């Protein structure tokens, strides 16, 4: 059976529209892109066919949607036929899942998947950004990491701490891993206060874009210096007054629902069950996302503890070495006695290091 999308009638600033709602795949990139093409005045001149399709009924099939988007892409592009064919072959992945890698300076790794959005002249943004002004020496460097490169550094640091691998820049890897782990631990919703501020400043008024967050894609709109995401959860299908959700806080605690004209919306308890999941609230992340966040927290905690233990051991050894040097000056020790004691200490230290290594 072909997958389909349910449509919903909304009125935005006095104009009637039909938008697409989420199906079982959740807030996918295909949905966010299609709704921008439907709503954005900058794109509607190319999307008449899509608007007609959505207005046709209460549901449209995934196959029909992809075919119409392919037709639109052929209209707007000036790329050679070979290039456009390769990009169009990626269209189904907008629904299935994309390889999107956010970088902690606010950009993305330049992948083929990102080229699809450029093809439709639609911006993709995120707010998972490190504030490089707090500690310029550390955070400026960390801001050039992406999510995937951060994961590689965390794994590499774990291997170093367990003695599995060692190289000349091990200290640098361990330092970066500790700070990256703390950053991931402090931003489990993949949005930071600094990143949210940057989005408000960067995005243009009355313009649409796609917000990437927690592997989800949302239709984002800036209206009068405030950010709003289009509400596409199927649970709100019958809530005509709920069109937008403000993006005011990192954890969703200050976010609110708004009508199509951006006035406060009233939630009817009979229409909407209180346990409906909100798209990006920390308490409503998908199960696998919660597990990933907990894994990141645990890894960050272990790395921090291991780094502290390493520093403590180094300081202890330095003090012992300093004490021995002073003892040698004031009370010389016989060579054979010193050798036996040194051998015993080295053996004990070796046994202790082996017992403390935990394979992660």
From Swiss-Prot:
One of its GO terms (cellular component) is cytoplasm. It is an enzyme of class 3 (hydrolase). The active site is at 28 (nucleophile), 216 (proton acceptor). Residues 325-335, 349-360 have a biased composition (Basic and acidic residues). It catalyses: Thiol-dependent hydrolysis of ester, thioester, amide, peptide and isopeptide bonds formed by the C-terminal Gly of ubiquitin (a 76-residue protein attached to proteins as an intracellular targeting signal). Transmembrane segments: none annotated. GO terms for biological process: cellular response to pheromone; protein K48-linked deubiquitination; proteolysis. Its main location: cytoplasm. Keywords: Cytoplasm, Hydrolase, Protease, Thiol protease, Ubl conjugation pathway. The record marks 296, 299-300, 303 as: Ubiquitin-binding. Pfam families: MINDY_DUB. It is found in: Cytoplasm. One of its GO terms (molecular function) is cysteine-type deubiquitinase activity. PANTHER family: NF-E2 INDUCIBLE PROTEIN (PTHR18063), UBIQUITIN CARBOXYL-TERMINAL HYDROLASE (PTHR18063:SF6). Present with 2050 molecules/cell in log phase SD medium. Hydrolase that can specifically remove 'Lys-48'-linked conjugated ubiquitin from proteins. Has endodeubiquitinase activity. This is Ubiquitin carboxyl-terminal hydrolase MIY1. The lineage of its organism: Eukaryota, Fungi, Dikarya, Ascomycota, Saccharomycotina.
């Amino acid at each position: 059976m072909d997958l389909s999308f349910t449509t919903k009638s909304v009125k935005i600033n006095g104009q009637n529209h039909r938008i697409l709602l989420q199906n079982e795949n959740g807030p996918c990139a295909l949905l966010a892109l299609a709704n921008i093409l439907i709503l954005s005045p900058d794109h509607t001149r190319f999307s008449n066919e899509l608007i007609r399709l959505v207005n046709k009924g209460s549901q449209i099939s995934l196959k029909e949607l992809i075919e119409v988007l392919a037709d639109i892409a052929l209209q707007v592009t000036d790329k050679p036929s070979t290039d456009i064919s390769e990009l169009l072959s990626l269209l189904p992945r907008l629904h299935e899942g994309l390889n999107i890698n956010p970088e902690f300076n606010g950009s993305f790794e330049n992948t083929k998947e990102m080229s699809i959005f450029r093809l439709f002249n639609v911006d993709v943004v995120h707010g998972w950004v490190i504030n490089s002004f707090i500690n310029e020496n550390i955070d400026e460097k960390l801001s050039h990491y992406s999510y995937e490169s951060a994961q590689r550094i965390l794994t590499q640091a774990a291997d170093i701490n367990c003695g599995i691998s060692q190289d000349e820049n091990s200290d640098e890897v361990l330092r970066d891993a500790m700070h990256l782990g703390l950053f991931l631990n402090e931003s489990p919703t993949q949005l930071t206060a600094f990143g949210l501020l940057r989005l408000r400043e960067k995005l243009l008024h009355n313009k649409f874009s796609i917000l990437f967050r927690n592997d989800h894609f949302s239709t984002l709109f800036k209206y009068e210096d405030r950010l709003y995401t289009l509400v596409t959860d199927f649970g709100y299908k019958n809530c005509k007054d709920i069109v937008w959700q403000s993006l005011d806080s990192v954890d969703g605690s200050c976010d609110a629902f708004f009508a199509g004209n951006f006035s406060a919306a009233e939630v009817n308890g009979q229409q909407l069950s209180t346990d409906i999941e909100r798209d990006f609230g920390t308490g409503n992340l998908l199960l696998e996302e919660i597990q990933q966040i907990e894994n990141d927290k645990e890894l960050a905690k272990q790395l921090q503890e291991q780094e502290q233990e390493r520093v403590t051991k180094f300081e202890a050894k330095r003090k012992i070495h300093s004490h021995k040097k002073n003892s040698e000056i004031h009370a010389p020790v016989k060579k054979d006695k010193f050798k036996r004691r040194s051998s015993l200490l080295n053996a004990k230290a070796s046994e202790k290091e082996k017992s403390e290594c935990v394979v992660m």
